[in-house]
C-alpha cells in the first residue's frame, strides 16, 4: 500500500521567529534545495529577514495575512506557521522550527529529516494493533508472530511527528529545574501511535498530508500570557490532540519517532524563574481527560465533519470552564471558514 510522493507535492513551511536565517538555511541546503519553501515571518517582528539565495521560496509577511480580513485567529509567534499551511497548495507539508539544524544519527551520518518524513507518510501506519518490533514497514523490521494478517495492510499515515536532540522541549517549570539537561539519546525507531492513545505533538519537527488533514491543522488554543518560546505555548499540543482524534475516527494513522533534528541552545539559558505559575499545567489537566473520553459520531465522515463536531463539543463542554477554550472553539470555527475560502485549493 506504499505511496509515491513526488518532490513537487511537498512544501516546506518555516515559521521565521528570528531575522537572520542564514545559518539555518545553509545547514539545511542539501535537503531543502529541491523543494518549494514557504517562509512565514512572525507579524510581530520588525527586522528584515536575512535568507541566503539559491532556494525556491516565497516569504509571507503581516501584509499577506491582512488579505484574510478580520479574523479571530492570531498568527503571531509560533502560530505564524499555520498561515503557511493555509496558503500552501501542495499535498504534503513539512515544518521545522527555525532554531533547529540537521541532526546526526548514531553512526555520525547527517539525518535527512525531509526524506524520513516522506518515508513515514508514504508507508502505512498500523494503529489498530501494536507491533512490538516498531514500524513493520521499515527496512529490517516486520510484523511479529501473532499480528493478524487482516490488519497487515495498514492504513494511510496522515501525520508524522519527528523528535529532537540537544535542547529539550520542556514546560517552563521543568525548564528551570533541568536547565542544563539535554536530549542525547538517538532512538533509531518509528512507531505508529495506537488507536485511542493521545500524545503531546510538538510543532518543532512535523509533517502531514495537507490535502486530507489541512482542515484540522489550526492554531486554536492560546494561553493568556503566550510568548515566543515553545515553553510558552500549547497551540501545537492542542492541534495534535485534535488531529489525533480525527485520525482515529476516520481510521488514519499517526507516527512518531524518526526523524530527529538538533535544537539549538539559543533559548535554553533564558531567565525563567519569573514563571512561578504556568497556565498550561492546569489546562492540560482538563484537556487530556476531555480528549481521552471524546468519541466523534459515526455521522462525521470527513475531516471537515469531524472539525465541526469537535468544535461544537469544545464549545459546549470546555467553553464554560475557561475562556481560553471558548476562544479556541471560535478559532476552530474561523479556521474552517478560512480553509474553505483560502486553503482548500490544491496545486
From Swiss-Prot:
It is found in: Golgi apparatus. Its main location: Golgi. Coiled coil: none annotated. One of its GO terms (biological process) is cell wall organization. Is not reversibly glycosylated in vitro by UDP-glucose, UDP-xylose and UDP-galactose. Glycans are attached at residue 145. One of its GO terms (cellular component) is cytosol. Keywords: Cell wall biogenesis/degradation, Glycoprotein, Golgi apparatus. It holds the Pfam family RGP. The record marks 145, 152 as: Required for activity. InterPro entries: RGP, RGP_fam. One of its GO terms (molecular function) is UDP-arabinopyranose mutase activity. Belongs to the RGP family. Probable inactive UDP-L-arabinose mutase. Inactive in vitro, but associates with UAM1 and UAM3. Heteromers with UAM1 and UAM3. This is Probable inactive UDP-arabinopyranose mutase 2. It comes from Oryza sativa subsp. japonica. The lineage of its organism: Eukaryota, Viridiplantae, Streptophyta, Embryophyta, Tracheophyta.
Amino acid at each position: 500500500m506504499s505511496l509515491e510522493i513526488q518532490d513537487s507535492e511537498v512544501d516546506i513551511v518555516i515559521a521565521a521567529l528570528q531575522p537572520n536565517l542564514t545559518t539555518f538555511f545553509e545547514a539545511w541546503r542539501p535537503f531543502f534545495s529541491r523543494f518549494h519553501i514557504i517562509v512565514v515571518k512572525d507579524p510581530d517582528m520588525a527586522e528584515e529577514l536575512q535568507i541566503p539565495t539559491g532556494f525556491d521560496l516565497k516569504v509571507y509577511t503581516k501584509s499577506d495575512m491582512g488579505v484574510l480580513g478580520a479574523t479571530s485567529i492570531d498568527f503571531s509567534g509560533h502560530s505564524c506557521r499555520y498561515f503557511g499551511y493555509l496558503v500552501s497548495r501542495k499535498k504534503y507539508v513539512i515544518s521545522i522550527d527555525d532554531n533547529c539544524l540537521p541532526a546526526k544519527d548514531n553512526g555520525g551520518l547527517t539525518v535527512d529529516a525531509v526524506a524520513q518524513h516522506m518515508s513515514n507518510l508514504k508507508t502505512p501506519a498500523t494503529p489498530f494493533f501494536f507491533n512490538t518490533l516498531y514500524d513493520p514497514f521499515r527496512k529490517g523490521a516486520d510484523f511479529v508472530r501473532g499480528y493478524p494478517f487482516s490488519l497487515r495492510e495498514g492504513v494511510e499515515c496522515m501525520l508524522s511527528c519527528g523528535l529532537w536532540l540537544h535542547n529539550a522541549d520542556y514546560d517552563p517549570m521543568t525548564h528551570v529545574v533541568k536547565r542544563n539537561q539535554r536530549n542525547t539519546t538517538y532512538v533509531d525507531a518509528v512507531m505508529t501511535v495506537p488507536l485511542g492513545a493521545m500524545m503531546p505533538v510538538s510543532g518543532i519537527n512535523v509533517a502531514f498530508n495537507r490535502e486530507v488533514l489541512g482542515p484540522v491543522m489550526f492554531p486554536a488554543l492560546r494561553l493568556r500570557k503566550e510568548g515566543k518560546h515553545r515553553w510558552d505555548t500549547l497551540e501545537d499540543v492542542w492541534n495534535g490532540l485534535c488531529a489525533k482524534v480525527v485520525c482515529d475516527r476516520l481510521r488514519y494513522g499517526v507516527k512518531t519517532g524518526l526523524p530527529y533534528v538538533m535544537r539549538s541552545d539559543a533559548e535554553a539559558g533564558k531567565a525563567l524563574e519569573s514563571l512561578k505559575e504556568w497556565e498550561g499545567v492546569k489546562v492540560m489537566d482538563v484537556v487530556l481527560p476531555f480528549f481521552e473520553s471524546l468519541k466523534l459520531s459515526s455521522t462525521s465522515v470527513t475531516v471537515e465533519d469531524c472539525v465541526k463536531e469537535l468544535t461544537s463539543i469544545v464549545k459546549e463542554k470546555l467553553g464554560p470552564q475557561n475562556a481560553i477554550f471558548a476562544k479556541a472553539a471560535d478559532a476552530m470555527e474561523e479556521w474552517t471558514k478560512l480553509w474553505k475560502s483560502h486553503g482548500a485549493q490544491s496545486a
